[in-house]
A protein has these predicted regions:
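Polar/charged alpha-helical tracts
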Residues: 8-12, 18, 136, 158, ...
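ABC family nucleotide-binding domain
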Residues: 24-29, 33-244
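C-terminal boundary and immediately downstream tail of ABC-type ATPase nucleotide-binding domains
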Residues: 2-4, 10-11, 233-236, 242-264
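ABC-family P-loop ATPase nucleotide-binding domain
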Residues: 1-33
Length: 264
């Protein structure tokens, strides 16, 4: 059931889609505010994500989507409010960032692969230095993660030898190898052409089908409608409307109606 999130009534958002009602909440944002200088980017953002849920966050540029995602992984600190992920208080000044980053994987639009390392070495790097795995174990885990995204045969290739879609899939494998409880995707297909976009979206759809908890900032409306358990529409730093995928066919607010019309 769709809900309209007014600034004074953000608690309306604390509704988990029916298929996920039995699952515990793994991500919780409560009245989160964030400013950059005098520019207030997040204005009382509140929502919850159940374990195994796939949430798509949509909205115009500057609506706060990516900032919300970055705050979840403590890449940005919030001004007020609270964020909890997998039992970790992200807003705690003393939060163990190494523990948080083991629980949360994040993939960006830019691939951030090391050009001097081959694909396998890129995926193994965090396993060796963060998880302290020996080389044999890190290799086994990395190859399994690459197989999960369909790139195990490219283990010996270097980033410059891969297409943009393949590089993005390596970036996803690198995060998956750490066995996170939550995966965050920040407009990961926005720099790819339609053909390469499709191969990345298929990997993400497989992850969602496998029960991975995912938050996805995207402009791929058809994908969001088809795959997401719920869609969150953000507008001017607030959660404005939230509901299942078919809410895109029946938007409640004029703001979402205008956003969808502009996206056509």
């Amino acid at each position: 059931m769709s809900a309209i999130a007014k600034p004074e009534a953000v608690t309306q958002l604390r509704t988990v889609a029916p298929a996920q009602e039995a699952q515990p909440v793994i991500v919780r944002l409560d009245q989160v505010y964030k400013s950059f200088g005098e520019n207030q980017v997040l204005k009382g953002v509140s929502f919850e994500v159940a374990r195994g849920e796939m949430i798509a966050i949509i909205g115009a540029s500057g609506s706060g989507k990516s900032t919300a995602l970055r705050c979840i992984d403590r890449l940005e600190t919030i001004d007020s409010g609270s964020i909890e992920v997998a039992g970790i208080r992200v807003d705690d000044p003393q939060v163990d960032l190494h523990r948080l980053r083991r629980e949360v994987g994040i993939v960006f639009q830019s691939y951030n692969l090391f050009p001097h390392l081959n694909v396998l070495e890129n995926v193994m790097l965090a396993l060796r230095h963060v998880k302290q795995q020996d080389r044999a174990e890190a290799r086994r885990v990395a190859l399994a993660a690459l197989a999960q995204v369909g790139l195990d045969e490219k283990a010996g290739a270097y980033p410059e030898q891969l297409s943009g879609g393949q590089q993005q899939r390596v970036a996803i494998a690198r995060s998956l190898a750490m066995s996170p409880k939550v995966m965050l995707f920040d407009e990961v297909t926005s720099a790819l052409d339609p053909q390469l976009t499709g191969e990345v979206l298929r990997v993400m759809e497989d992850l969602a089908a496998g029960g991975m908890t995912m938050l996805l900032v995207t402009h791929e409306m058809n994908f969001a409608k088809r795959v997401a358990d719920r869609i969150i529409y953000m507008h001017q730093g607030r959660v404005w409307e939230v509901g299942p995928g078919d809410m895109l066919d029946h938007p409640h607010t004029p703001e979402l109606q205008a956003f969808l019309a502009a996206d056509l």
